[in-house]
């Protein structure tokens, strides 16, 4: 079975959290890619979704999600809705997902897909992801699906005590980072090299 093949690949890549694997199995990735790419939907690779954006490789979705949910977050902020695939995976794992997308056409399509899957524990906003969603915070966890040139202060400010921020950071050389808040203190860990589209700061489209 094509889904099981992907799950086996993720397990071989050291994805161990059964909750993450179950969520990925539940989300039909073919709904989140262009019809012409549907035959590649369950491949462990990133795919273009238009507007210069991509749907992330399932391994990276699983890796970031696994890091994010270790503190069992209830309310999660996602920066960069994109196709809505990562949003859908999160929606199977947490109480509520707040997601921000700066490209209106992508946000519209993502909302349609999430409704189609009866995922109603998602609030979506068209806006500048660098700013987060301050009036809905603080958040137990924040996930960023595009690479910031530096860690946005607005996002660390919206992180609850005990919360986790998972994001790619860098321009030409990017690393996946995990930032944790304990009271007023932030600790940061660099995890692995990655490659993401850039997180744009500025006017929405």
UniProtKB/Swiss-Prot annotation:
Gene3D superfamilies per UniProt: Vaccinia Virus protein VP39
Subcellular location: Cytoplasm
An individual GO BP term: protein modification process
Superkingdom of source: Bacteria
Active site: 56
GO cellular component: cytoplasm
InterPro entries noted in UniProt: PCMT, SAM-dependent_MTases_sf
SUPFAM superfamilies found in the cross-reference section: S-adenosyl-L-methionine-dependent methyltransferases (SSF53335)
Keywords, ordered alphabetically: Cytoplasm, Methyltransferase, S-adenosyl-L-methionine, Transferase
Coiled coil: none
Protein family (similarity comment): Belongs to the methyltransferase superfamily. L-isoaspartyl/D-aspartyl protein methyltransferase family.
NCBIfam families, alphabetized: pimt (TIGR00080), PRK00312.1 (NF001453)
Function: Catalyzes the methyl esterification of L-isoaspartyl residues in peptides and proteins that result from spontaneous decomposition of normal L-aspartyl and L-asparaginyl residues. It plays a role in the repair and/or degradation of damaged proteins.
The protein, known as: Protein-L-isoaspartate O-methyltransferase
Origin species: Aeromonas salmonicida (strain A449)
């Amino acid at each position: 079975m094509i889904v099981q093949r992907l799950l086996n690949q993720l397990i071989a890549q050291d994805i161990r959290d059964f909750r993450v694997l179950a969520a990925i199995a539940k989300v039909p990735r073919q709904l989140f890619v262009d019809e012409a790419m549907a035959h590649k939907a369950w491949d462990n690779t990133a795919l273009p979704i238009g507007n210069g954006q991509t749907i992330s490789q399932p391994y990276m979705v699983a890796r970031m999600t696994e890091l994010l949910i270790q503190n069992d977050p209830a309310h999660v902020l996602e920066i960069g809705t994109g196709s809505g695939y990562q949003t859908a995976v999160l929606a199977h794992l947490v109480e509520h997902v707040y997601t921000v997308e700066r490209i209106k056409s992508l946000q519209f399509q993502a909302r349609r897909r999430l409704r189609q899957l009866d995922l109603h524990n998602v609030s979506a906003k068209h806006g500048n992801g660098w700013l987060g969603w301050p009036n809905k915070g603080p958040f137990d966890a924040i996930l960023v699906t595009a690479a910031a040139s530096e860690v946005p202060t607005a996002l660390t400010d919206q992180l609850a005590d005990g919360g986790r921020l998972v994001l790619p950071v860098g321009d030409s050389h990017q690393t996946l980072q995990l930032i944790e808040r304990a009271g007023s203190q932030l600790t940061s860990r660099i995890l692995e090299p990655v490659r993401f589209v850039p997180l744009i700061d500025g006017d929405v489209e």
